[in-house]
């Protein structure tokens, strides 16, 4: 009996280098994690473009932090540096920053984008706020 094979062997897909000089950095900073996504000037992933417009991304968990260490400003700094380095490989030089969320890594992530060599054009706070919408969760009792 011939040995079983597991289907066709896939070739690793080659990542093509995009040449984008201007982009957007979306920093989502929650109480538990910080996620930095760097996109092209048209913004984040759209429904019409399934591949999306994300050039690079990194989170505190992806960089190597676990548990409560993901919520620290240092973890946000490392995540922003990692995302910026990957974006610079695609030729990115200038970003407009959009910050969302109440987390502790907001300012640190912006500073580390600048320190990594990206020029920050503008900073906008796009944190969603409810206009008396859903009822908030009950108060914590510790």
UniProtKB/Swiss-Prot annotation:
rRNA-binding in keyword set: yes
Gene3D superfamilies: Ribosomal protein S11
Assigned keywords, A-Z: Ribonucleoprotein, Ribosomal protein, RNA-binding, rRNA-binding
Any one biological process term the GO annotation gives: translation
Pfam families according to UniProt: Ribosomal_S11
Biased composition (Basic residues): 7-17
GO cellular component, one term: ribosome
InterPro entries registered for this protein in UniProt: Ribosomal_uS11, Ribosomal_uS11_bac-type, Ribosomal_uS11_CS, Ribosomal_uS11_sf
Disulfide bonds: none
Quaternary structure note: Part of the 30S ribosomal subunit. Interacts with proteins S7 and S18. Binds to IF-3.
Record family assignment: Belongs to the universal ribosomal protein uS11 family.
Function in brief: Located on the platform of the 30S subunit, it bridges several disparate RNA helices of the 16S rRNA. Forms part of the Shine-Dalgarno cleft in the 70S ribosome.
Protein name, entry field: Small ribosomal subunit protein uS11
């Amino acid at each position: 009996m011939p040995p079983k094979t597991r289907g066709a062997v896939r070739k690793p897909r080659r990542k093509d280098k995009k040449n984008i000089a201007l982009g957007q950095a979306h920093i989502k900073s929650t109480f538990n994690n910080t996620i930095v996504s760097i996109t092209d000037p048209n913004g984040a992933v759209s429904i019409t473009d399934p591949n999306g417009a994300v050039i690079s991304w990194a989170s505190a968990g992806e960089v190597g932090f676990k548990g409560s260490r993901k919520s620290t400003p240092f973890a946000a700094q490392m995540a922003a540096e990692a995302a910026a380095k990957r974006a610079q490989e695609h030729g990115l030089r200038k970003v407009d920053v959009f910050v969302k969320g109440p987390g502790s890594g907001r300012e640190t992530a912006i500073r580390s984008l600048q320190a990594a060599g990206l020029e920050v054009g503008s900073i906008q706070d796009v944190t969603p706020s409810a206009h008396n919408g859903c009822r908030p969760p009950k108060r914590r009792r510790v």
